[in-house]
Amino acid sequence: MKPTFLEFRHLKTLLALKETGSVSLAAKRVYLTQSALSHQIKLIEEQFGLPLFERKSNPLRFTSAGERLIRLANEVMPKVIDAERDLARVKHGDAGQLRIAVECHTCFDWLMPAMDEFRQHWGLVELDIVSGFHTDPVGLLLSHRADWAIVSEIEHNDDVIFKPLFSYEMVGICSKNHSLAEKDIWEAEDFIDETWVTYPVPDDMLDLWRKVLKSKGINPTRRTTELTIAMIQLVASRRGIATIPYWAALPYLEKGYVVARKVTKEGLYSNLYAAIRKEDESLSYLEDFYQTVKSQSFSTLPGLSVLNL
């Protein structure tokens, strides 16, 4: 039997290119340098004597040969993942409990689709969200009131394992008729005379406060709301400005309710991590949920970046 050239890693690379539309972003997704990924693609093209995508296209446009390999990857990858799940069930069983605690008001936008996909493969795992917003989800883990937590910072605790989910950009939003809509980039001083609409959380959990305003001694007037849609309504009505994840703002940007602007020249970026108890490290369904959340997030949320520990 003639040996095949294509390997599983090639298919992962091609899917990353398809989903990100960029060589640099795809390289980060599969944990390669950009030159290593380009070399991998070059070897595939040389093997078959065909280009896989059009050079200098943005986003990448795949050739017919490239699209054929993408179809192959879409067929093979789910089967490999299913086989790995089956083996995990044989080893560890397929029942358990997975209670999720979050410290992020916008997490539900991407968490629910991941939970739905997970249920299809782990029907005997009791899946639930610990009700309410939590300022100490790690404490819930350690007290056995939660089994999986989403946090924005890593704590040093030998009893907890942290795994990177992704990094994302926070953008400033305001009414289309607001004076700040004329600025491409907002700096700390732009918030001085504004009403800042936030979620009702402690200051140290607000990225804009921690990373931009606090060091400048700027503390604008506040207004709080639990709901993102209520925040959008206040901003659209010129009763304040806000900072939220780009993915959370996008549906309202597309409808023209508000406009989004970059916060500082460097941008305002935040991170999210998954946390589990050290004693639960071997539970296969927890690892599969982690992989499902990452996969769903990068597939559906715009503007994410790979995050490393």
Swiss-Prot record:
Which residue range or ranges hold the HTH lysR-type domain? 6-63
Taxonomic superkingdom: Bacteria
> Per the record's keyword annotation, is Cytoplasm included, yes or no?
yes
Keyword DNA-binding among UniProt keywords? yes
GO annotation, cellular component aspect: cytoplasm
User: From the UniProt annotation, which stretches of this protein bind DNA?
Assistant: 23-42
Q: Which GO terms describe its molecular function?
A: DNA-binding transcription factor activity; transcription cis-regulatory region binding
Which BP terms does GO give this entry? methionine biosynthetic process; regulation of DNA-templated transcription
Which InterPro entries does this chain map to?
LysR_subst-bd, MetR_PBP2, Tscrpt_reg_HTH_LysR, WH-like_DNA-bd_sf, WH_DNA-bd_sf
Q: Name one Pfam family in it.
A: HTH_1
Q: Kindly list the places in or outside the cell where this protein is found, as annotated in its UniProt entry.
A: Cytoplasm
UniProt keywords, alphabetically: Activator, Amino-acid biosynthesis, Cytoplasm, DNA-binding, Methionine biosynthesis, Repressor, Transcription, Transcription regulation
Q: Indicate the family of this protein.
A: Belongs to the LysR transcriptional regulatory family.
**PANTHER family associated with the record:** HTH-TYPE TRANSCRIPTIONAL REGULATOR (PTHR30126), HTH-TYPE TRANSCRIPTIONAL REGULATOR METR (PTHR30126:SF25)
Role: Control of the last step in methionine biosynthesis; MetR is a positive activator of the metA, metE and metH genes.
The protein here is known as: HTH-type transcriptional regulator MetR
Please name the source species: Haemophilus influenzae (strain ATCC 51907 / DSM 11121 / KW20 / Rd)
